[in-house]
Structure formats: C-alpha cells, structure tokens
Amino acid sequence: MPRRREVPKRKVLADPKYGSELLTKFVNMVMRDGKRSVAEKIMYGALERIESKGHETPMEVLETALENVQPKVEVKSRRVGGATYQVPVEVRPERRTTLAMRWLLDAARKRGETTMALRLAGEMLDASESRGAAVKKREDTHRMAEANKAFSHYRW
C-alpha cells in the first residue's frame, strides 16, 4: 500500500429531483451495467410508491429506513496463532450507510413483488418500521458481535 497522501474522496452530485447526495449514492448502487436511467426509474418509482401509500415525504422514509438498518458494530476475522477469531469492531460512519444501502437492496431483490420498484418500496417501508430482512441482517450482525465480545481485545 502506498504511504504517500490519502486519496481524496470523489464528491457525488446531488440528485436532480430531490437534491440529495444520499439518493444519488443509492441510485448508483441500484444501477447495473451502467444503466443509470433504469436505476433512476426504479428508485423514483419506489419513492413515488411510498408517497402514494400516504406516508410522510419519501426521503424521510428512506432516511429512517437507512438509520434502522445501519450496523453499529461488525465482526472481522483476525488470525492469532493458528486460530481465527471473529473480532467485533465499530463500523465507520461512511461504511455504515454503505452497508445499510447494500443490505436494503439485497433484501429488496429477494422479495416476491413483481417489479423492483415495488420490492424496494416495500423493503424501505418495512425497514423504516424496524422490520424486514434488512433489519434482521443488522440484528444478526450485532448478535455475532455480542457473542464474540470476549475477543474484542484483539482489535487492531
């Protein structure tokens, strides 16, 4: 690894419709094979679906969903003298949101609704109410960290 200067983070442009960088990042994660317009259609469709269900602003639902899915701690494998320990470590803020988005998307892709926009809307609504597969994933991660608390002194 080079030990020179730290590579600057690239700024993501705010979303044209809602003016949110978070939404742009989410669209980038939904996007496959560089098809941004398709990803935007899915994302906006999901947000419109949330709005039509009579909820507060869809961006608030998205933010609460991400807040409820963000993990505080995770486990990382650490090899110590032939044995591999699952060491609990705190998650950096940027990684928290990235993991939350990834887990929301994975959970949405596994749902049974007909279109991806409906699946994503359903998963976001579930997550904003602290239920659903994405929230379960976070709870499982926290449970793993809690179970391996004894190895926390192996942190690096």
UniProtKB/Swiss-Prot annotation:
GO terms classed as biological process: translation
PROSITE patterns: RIBOSOMAL_S7
Organism annotation: Alkalilimnicola ehrlichii (strain ATCC BAA-1101 / DSM 17681 / MLHE-1)
Subunit record text: Part of the 30S ribosomal subunit. Contacts proteins S9 and S11.
Keyword Transport: no
Function: One of the primary rRNA binding proteins, it binds directly to 16S rRNA where it nucleates assembly of the head domain of the 30S subunit. Is located at the subunit interface close to the decoding center, probably blocks exit of the E-site tRNA.
Lineage of origin: Bacteria, Pseudomonadati, Pseudomonadota, Gammaproteobacteria, Chromatiales
Annotated protein name in UniProt: Small ribosomal subunit protein uS7
Molecular function (Gene Ontology), one example: rRNA binding
GO cellular component, one term: small ribosomal subunit
Record key words, sorted: Ribonucleoprotein, Ribosomal protein, RNA-binding, rRNA-binding, tRNA-binding
Recorded name of the encoding gene: rpsG
Family under the similarity heading: Belongs to the universal ribosomal protein uS7 family.
One Pfam family matching this protein: Ribosomal_S7
